[in-house]
Amino acid sequence: MTSVSDCFAQLRDRGQCALIPFLTAGDPDLATTASALRQLDASGADLIELGVPYSDPLADGPVIQAAATRALQRGTRLDQVLEMVTELSPEIRAPIILFTYYNPIYHRGVAEFLQQIAKAGVRGLVVPDLPLEESENLLQQAADLGIEVTLLVAPTSSKERIEKIALRSQGFIYLVSTTGVTGMRTKVENRVQDLIADLRQVTDKPIGVGFGISRTEHARQVMDWGADAAIVGSAFVNRLSEGSPSQGLSAISTFCRSLKSSLLLDA
């Protein structure tokens, strides 16, 4: 499994935009999550974001909140998620990016948490409620273990703050496409194009756009605006949760292939 940065570099050399699906670990169960990760890896996902279920997911919309609740009710905990990733990571090509809120990191201890996820094979980390001003310790310790911590840029961020985030973010920069929480929306707001342009003025790091990207035309739109990755969450979580596990796995595989096709330059 390559690093997040190396994956983006390889895609950039080929002139391709990355597809980053998101799944909630443990919904409907960890065995299905493992199968889903394999399916996504085989169906065109370039990197995969794996959410650790949390009881108070402030950045997540109703679809992902419901998935986290179901996973927690089934007893899914961080240790079990990491056991699954440990077994799975040698099998798949796409780097795994762990998405978790800061509270579980704090309670486990930054050093121990990072050592455990590095041992499991995690290559990237997104912590949506980590303030920029408090990120340095986590960023440094993670870098020492080969884990790239990606920071988020909000639509309301000032240009000065955007520049600071771009300087510190590792792997890529996560551009939030809309104010509010994650979820499926009908269109991508036009101001995302301006935000991508603002970032391009201060960094050459890859830019991934997420929150509200739920259709093939959304993914194509952000690529045409200059993004290096389309991050798709609720639409995958929703498809996996509908019907039986086998039906959900088939649905996300088909959707993943469709999204990846839309991101190819000759689509």
UniProtKB/Swiss-Prot annotation:
Catalytic activity entry: (1S,2R)-1-C-(indol-3-yl)glycerol 3-phosphate + L-serine = D-glyceraldehyde 3-phosphate + L-tryptophan + H2O
Keyword Cell membrane: no
Tree of life domain: Bacteria
GO cellular component, one term: cytosol
A GO term, aspect molecular function: tryptophan synthase activity
Enzyme Commission number, as recorded: 4.2.1.20
Cysteine pairs bridged by disulfides in the record: none
Active site: E49 (proton acceptor), D60 (proton acceptor)
InterPro entries per the UniProt record, alphabetical: Aldolase_TIM, RibuloseP-bd_barrel, Trp_synthase_alpha_AS, Trp_synthase_suA
UniProt keyword terms in alphabetical order: Amino-acid biosynthesis, Aromatic amino acid biosynthesis, Lyase, Tryptophan biosynthesis
Record bears the keyword Lyase: yes
Pathway named in the protein's UniProt entry: Amino-acid biosynthesis; L-tryptophan biosynthesis; L-tryptophan from chorismate: step 5/5
Family classification: Belongs to the TrpA family.
Subunit structure: Tetramer of two alpha and two beta chains.
Function: The alpha subunit is responsible for the aldol cleavage of indoleglycerol phosphate to indole and glyceraldehyde 3-phosphate.
Name assigned to this protein: Tryptophan synthase alpha chain
Organism per entry: Acaryochloris marina (strain MBIC 11017)
